[in-house]
Amino acid sequence: MLKDEYGRVVTNLRIAVTKKCNLRCFYCHKEGESNPGEEISAERIVEIARAFKELGVRKLKITGGEPLLRKDLPDIILNLPEFEEISMTTNGILLEKYAEELRECGLSRVNVSLDTLDAEKYRWITGGGEVQKVVNGIEKACEVGLTPVKINMLVLGGVNDNEVDELLEFTNSFNRGNTKAILQVIELVPFPGFEKYFFDISTIEEKYARMATQRRVRAMHRRTQYFTPKGVIEFVKPMDNTAFCMHCNRMRVTSDGKLKPCLLRNETITIDGKHGEELARAIIETVRKREPYFKG
């Protein structure tokens, strides 16, 4: 079991398999990477994943950049050890093309970033992306069983803060008898230069909390899922949130193969050249030293 000095058990691993992306979203935090080096190899991804699995990690999430830009991604997924869940975060542009193959290789489900259904607004946010490709990708993911699809909507003040109802209606259109899609509403981390887009999503959450017919509190950051007549919706508030940090159960691996204990900190731990027991010891020690960014 991987546990830090605050009693937080690491059960989830996020591996950024590439720094490359086919969109240019103006707010992107690049998984906390500032100057990534050489891209991690497929063999090293599998080796690190196996080390974490042997130390008790149960779930793996593949991130980027845009993971679908790696041509060897199907082989990577095929060679991963067996986790309770292997999921992937994607912008969805290439998802329609690869969804079925990735499902056959062992991918469990996907998170798809979609901040708006408005074509012009989407093009502006993403630096030229086509929203219909994302919609097609979500439809394909639901069709082949990469479910539940979580649609990640980052709320941007003055841009899309009035579009939650529309995105939830779109999300719920896939739920015919069972939950195939969930809307995940995310509060912006106001990194320098983006403060003007920050929007406190508490008021939106209060609205859906009032109409919820059922609630489920997830272990991940103690987040609440609301089951409403309009669909299933969840809220992610990372800023100034001690509960978010005190229930953090994840570790990150950067696209150049370093350990990153916290998204909001610049610290990375080099594990180059470490294998077997030496790699395991490095992981254990890195986890042990983790600290919450926001403390009570």
Swiss-Prot record:
What cofactor does this chain's UniProt record say it requires? Answer: [4Fe-4S] cluster
**What enzyme category does the UniProt record give?**
lyase
Enzyme Commission numbers on file: 4.1.99.22
Biological process according to GO: Mo-molybdopterin cofactor biosynthetic process
HAMAP family per UniProt: MoaA_A (MF_01225_A)
- PANTHER family attached to this UniProt entry: MOLYBDENUM COFACTOR BIOSYNTHESIS PROTEIN 1, MOLYBDOPTERIN COFACTOR SYNTHESIS PROTEIN A
User: What family is reported?
Assistant: Belongs to the radical SAM superfamily. MoaA family.
Protein name, per record = Probable GTP 3',8-cyclase
Traced from the root, the source organism's taxonomic lineage reads:
Archaea, Methanobacteriati, Methanobacteriota, Archaeoglobi, Archaeoglobales
